[in-house]
Amino acid sequence: MAGIYIAMGAMVYLSISDKLAASLFFATGILLVLNLHNRLFTRVCPLFAYNGSYRPGDLFIAWIGNGIGTALVAILIHFTRFEAGILGRIEEIVIPKLADSPVSLTILGLFCALFVAFAVFVGGIRQKQGTFAQIFYVWLFITAFV
């Protein structure tokens, strides 16, 4: 389900032209993952390293499951009118990345993963679920990387 929640957040992100507003709404996918205890890969990794609450096999399950959930949403969107509205925004995001170097993409990907890990750790572990503090920290870190 985590891949589905993140893909839904991405759908909203892609449909809003204002980047700040879009970033704020993208975080709803992360909040769903945290509050519904789903296995988002970028949640499982830091918790595996931090407190061992996940096993190595959980990393694989989360990775495959996230990919399946995301692919399912992408396939379903393909059959809706929503697809036409977000294709231009997808191109704006993807084209610069295709022109970037592998080293740059790796470094930026690591920073992205760190921001998600911070959101999970500070917002999802250190704060009570559904509190203003949890929502604030998740939105802060996710908005920063998006």
Name each model-derived stretch.
Residues 1-146:
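Alpha-helical transmembrane segments and their helix-helix packing motifs
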